[in-house]
């Protein structure tokens, strides 16, 4: 693969995967940069945000960070009146939970973005956008997940046209 990036949420699974990649690059003194795709949902636990900031800053010498702050649609079950909400919605900037991170990529950075787009659709379109931007021949997106947690996660793994790699670790 000539283009590799990790999808990093700031959670345990993607955090372990990202740290394993960083350790491998450093341990083997590889002269490559690893892409990191982080969808910043605005409303996240402070400790998660702090962890994301810390890991990205500490490894900026080997990471190409794509921290996206996009007002895509996100499903919600917290309202009787809305079926979705939008992080980083411009018209609601006065009630944002926190300030947008420095160097965040916004909707202006992505020509494919449209207001009817859901977060999962954005992920898929981002992959194609990055592949084209890097003029890549083969792109690899690494995702650290436990399939027991979500049917959608399981479905993503077993969709066609993907390589599945499992290392034989003694957990």
Provide a role label for each language-model segment.
Residues 1-171:
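ATP-dependent adenylation/nucleotidyltransferase module used to activate substrates
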